[in-house]
């Protein structure tokens, strides 16, 4: 059977944007509504041309009285069409009540969890979602009203990992015409008209009002979406460009912002925070922007995550408690927080100190206002380009009566040379070597 104009346009979208490849298994998220029923029928008609297998999945959210009707409808339709369908029920109202989240948010989370699990368990490559251009408009408006950045503008994509949206750039009226022209049955979700749900209010109140200003609202928003996608691609290239300046150090992600402009710094801050599962809000971003010209500072992003700056370095880190002191005695390996030392008879690293008498040697944190030979340790660390957020974690090696070594900062001249019975305290490993080595050539030698 030849393709009609709409089906051909969807095929071109799939081929142009490489959404489906030969041999792919595709799982259609099938609610039974107009959009998902049109998507299922189009993909069934295109499956030979695309050389792919089509499956369907339906989650009964147990929210509406007619949910059973919808479940039975999609099951019966797929059975007649020869399409394997996966159907499950999940008590979304209880799920939302237990977690104190909204119905819309909870239903979406449950649905995506279900779809991803079905795809994984059955070796299915792609999940096809029936979002259209009107959905894109409504979602962007919803995100803008709630406060969003770039991620809110590009909230829906034609392809996002294993999810595809072949109908994303088609208007709802085109889908309605296709359904009517082909006599495709569907079910109507009566909650789509309930204005207590934010998306419905936007659909039935806000969008019609905006169309009085621009009758071609959908295409206007598609241009905004396209611009957002271009900007997002630029940010991805930016992250790749500076990837060698981003370091994962223990419970931190640190990046070097030297010679970066404000836009680049903020995008890297957002990226690194995202790697720590933190989504920065507008207020937090503005706070970071306001402090960019300050040399050192700290901002709490959540109960257990903070962002800190020292010199050109930014650190997004988990808050944790650190060991205060560690005694060093017999030869062997010693762990002081994230630092690893070894007391042995040989020099094994570039950072080391000779120990002439093992008695009373310890590794500890610095003390407030502490001085070495009359010079504040803080000033020494500043001269040595140690970022402020690392200074309290720098190990200080002491004998009974004096500080003999602070790695990368200071070595007592009496402990630079080996004596007959000396042992060597080597710094074998520290998670910040990439940072501490980076500015080594800029350091003033401390003696």
Swiss-Prot record:
It is an enzyme of class 6 (ligase). It holds the Pfam family TilS_C. The gene is tilS. One of its GO terms (molecular function) is ATP binding. Belongs to the tRNA(Ile)-lysidine synthase family. GO terms for biological process: tRNA modification. InterPro entries: Lysidine-tRNA-synth_C, Rossmann-like_a/b/a_fold, TilS/TtcA_N, tRNA_Ile_lys_synt, tRNA_Ile_lys_synt_N. Keywords: ATP-binding, Cytoplasm, Ligase, Nucleotide-binding, tRNA processing. It is found in: Cytoplasm. This is tRNA(Ile)-lysidine synthase. It comes from the Bacteria. ATP binds at residues 31-36. It catalyses: cytidine(34) in tRNA(Ile2) + L-lysine + ATP = lysidine(34) in tRNA(Ile2) + AMP + diphosphate + H(+). Ligates lysine onto the cytidine present at position 34 of the AUA codon-specific tRNA(Ile) that contains the anticodon CAU, in an ATP-dependent manner. Cytidine is converted to lysidine, thus changing the amino acid specificity of the tRNA from methionine to isoleucine. It comes from Pseudothermotoga lettingae (strain ATCC BAA-301 / DSM 14385 / NBRC 107922 / TMO). Its main location: cytoplasm.
């Amino acid at each position: 059977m030849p393709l009609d104009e709409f089906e051909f346009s969807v095929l071109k979208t799939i081929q142009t944007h490489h959404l489906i490849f030969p041999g792919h298994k595709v799982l259609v998220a099938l609610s039974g509504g107009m959009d998902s029923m049109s998507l299922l029928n189009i993909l069934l008609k295109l499956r030979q041309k695309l050389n792919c297998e089509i499956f369907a999945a339906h989650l009964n959210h147990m929210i509406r009285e007619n949910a059973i009707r919808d479940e039975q409808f999609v099951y019966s339709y797929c059975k007649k069409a020869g399409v394997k369908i996966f159907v499950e029920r999940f008590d979304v109202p209880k799920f939302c009540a237990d977690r104190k989240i909204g119905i819309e948010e909870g239903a979406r989370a449950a649905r995506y969890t279900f779809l991803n699990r079905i795809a994984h368990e059955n070796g299915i490559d792609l999940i096809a979602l029936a979002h259209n251009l009107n959905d894109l408009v409504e979602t962007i408006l919803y995100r803008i009203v709630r406060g969003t950045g770039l991620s809110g503008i590009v909230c829906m994509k034609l392809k996002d990992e294993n999810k595809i949206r072949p109908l994303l750039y088609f208007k709802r009226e085109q889908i309605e015409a296709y359904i009517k022209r082909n006599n495709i049955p569907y079910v109507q979700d009566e909650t789509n008209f309930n204005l207590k749900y934010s998306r419905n209010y936007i659909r039935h109140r806000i969008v019609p009002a905006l169309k009085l200003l621009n009758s071609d609202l959908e295409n206007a928003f598609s241009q905004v979406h396209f611009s957002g996608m271009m900007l997002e691609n630029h940010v991805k290239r930016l992250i790749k460009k500076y990837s060698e300046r981003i370091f994962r150090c223990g419970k931190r992600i640190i990046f070097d912002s030297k010679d970066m402009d404000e836009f680049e710094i903020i995008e890297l801050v957002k990226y690194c925070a995202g790697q720590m599962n933190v989504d920065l809000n507008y207020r937090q971003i503005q706070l970071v922007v306001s402090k960019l010209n300050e040399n050192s500072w700290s901002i709490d992003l959540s109960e257990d995550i903070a962002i800190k700056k020292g010199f050109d370095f930014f650190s997004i880190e988990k808050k944790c408690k650190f060991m205060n002191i560690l005694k060093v005695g017999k030869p062997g390996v010693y762990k002081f927080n994230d630092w690893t030392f070894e007391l042995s008879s040989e020099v094994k690293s570039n950072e080391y100190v000779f120990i002439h008498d093992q008695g009373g040697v310890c590794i500890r944190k610095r003390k407030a206002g502490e001085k070495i030979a009359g010079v504040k340790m803080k000033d020494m660390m500043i001269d040595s380009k140690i970022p402020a957020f690392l200074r309290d974690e720098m190990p200080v090696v002491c004998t009974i009566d004096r500080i003999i070594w602070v790695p990368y900062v200071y070595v007592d001249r009496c402990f630079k040379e080996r004596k007959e019975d000396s042992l060597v305290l080597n710094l074998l490993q520290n998670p910040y070597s990439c940072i501490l080595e980076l500015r080594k050539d800029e350091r003033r030698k401390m003696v």
